[in-house]
Regions:
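Sec-dependent signal peptide recognition
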Residues: 1-7
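C-terminal motif of bacterial Sec signal peptides marking the signal peptidase cleavage site
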Residues: 11-14
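Bacterial signal peptide processing site
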Residues: 16-20
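Pro/Ala/Gly-rich low-complexity, hydrophilic intrinsically disordered segments
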Residues: 24-29
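Periplasmic peptidoglycan-binding/anchoring modules of Gram-negative envelope and division proteins
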Residues: 31-45, 61-94, 122, 159-162, ...
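Extracytoplasmic
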Residues: 39, 48-50, 56, 78, ...
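Glycine- and acidic-rich phosphate- and metal-coordinating loops
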Residues: 54-56, 91-96
Length: 167
C-alpha cells in the first residue's frame, strides 16, 4: 500500500513540475514573439531556455566609445517596453569590442558598454535588479577585425533573457 501511495505522490509531483515547465516555456515563447514583432533592427532567437537579442551590427558604438548611438535609442525603448511587460525574466548584458586597443583596455571598455546599455534600459523603467552585465572584450568576435565593417560588427552588446526561476 505504501508503494502505491508513494508512486501516486511522485506521479502527481511530476505532473505539477511539467505544468510549471510548460508555463515557463509559454511565457518565454510569448516574450519571444513580442520581441520579434517589436524589434526589426535586432536578431531575436531562442537558445535552449533563453532568448538572445542582438541589435544590428555597426549601429551601437563608435570606436573606443561606450556611449550608445542616438539612432538605436528608439529600438531600446521598444525593447524595454517588452521587458517591462514580461517582468519574470532576468537579462544578462554582455559587452564586446573589436581588437583595437589592448586586451585589458578592451575588457574594461566592453564592461562599460554593457553598463551603458543597462543604464539606458533602466532609464526606460527596466528594474535594475533584473539586469546583470559582463564585459567580454575582444574574445568573442562575430566578424574578422581586418576591415572597418568587421570591427563595427564586433562593437556590440548582446542580451540573454532568462526566466527567473524564483517565480
Amino acid at each position: 500500500m505504501r508503494i502505491v501511495v508513494v508512486a501516486a505522490f511522485l506521479f502527481l509531483a511530476s505532473c505539477a513540475a511539467s505544468k510549471k515547465i510548460s508555463k515557463q516555456q509559454q511565457y518565454m515563447n510569448d516574450q519571444y514573439r513580442e520581441l520579434k514583432n517589436a524589434l526589426n533592427e535586432a536578431e531575436v532567437s531562442i537558445i535552449k531556455d533563453s532568448i538572445k537579442v542582438i541589435f544590428s551590427y555597426g549601429v551601437l558604438f563608435e570606436t573606443s566609445s561606450d556611449q550608445l548611438k542616438d539612432e538605436i535609442k528608439p529600438a531600446f525603448q521598444r525593447f524595454a517596453g517588452v521587458l517591462n511587460k514580461f517582468d519574470k525574466t532576468k537579462v544578462l548584458i554582455t559587452g564586446h569590442t573589436d581588437n583595437t586597443g589592448s586586451p585589458d583596455y578592451n575588457r574594461e571598455l566592453s564592461e562599460k558598454r554593457a553598463i551603458s546599455a543597462r543604464q539606458l534600459l533602466n532609464s526606460y523603467q527596466v528594474r535594475d535588479d533584473r539586469m546583470f552585465t559582463w564585459g567580454m572584450g575582444e574574445r568573442v568576435p562575430v566578424a574578422a577585425n581586418n576591415t572597418e565593417g568587421g570591427r563595427a560588427r564586433n562593437r556590440r552588446v548582446e542580451f540573454v533573457i532568462l526566466y527567473n526561476v524564483k517565480e
